[in-house]
């Protein structure tokens, strides 16, 4: 499986604009690839609430700055 590293300063499953766009990218890429995402710690709670509920969540690995 292809592995991808993404540095997304803002990434959040329940926001629009930059955080929402980054979430759209990583969640869709994770359907086909193993994705490692570096993002800000302020989004950690929101991300960790949603990722386990997603089928592709097993392919999404977050690292917080």
Pin down the residues of each PLM region:
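A short, charged, and often flexible helix/loop element on the N-terminal side
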Residues: 58-65
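N-terminal subdomain of nucleotide-sugar transferases
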Residues: 1-58
């Amino acid at each position: 499986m292809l592995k991808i590293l993404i540095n997304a300063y803002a990434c959040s499953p329940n926001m629009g604009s930059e955080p929402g766009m980054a979430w759209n990218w990583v969640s869709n890429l994770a359907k086909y690839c193993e994705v490692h995402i570096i993002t800000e710690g302020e989004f950690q709670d929101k991300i960790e609430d949603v990722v386990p509920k997603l089928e592709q969540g097993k392919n999404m690995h977050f690292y917080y700055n």
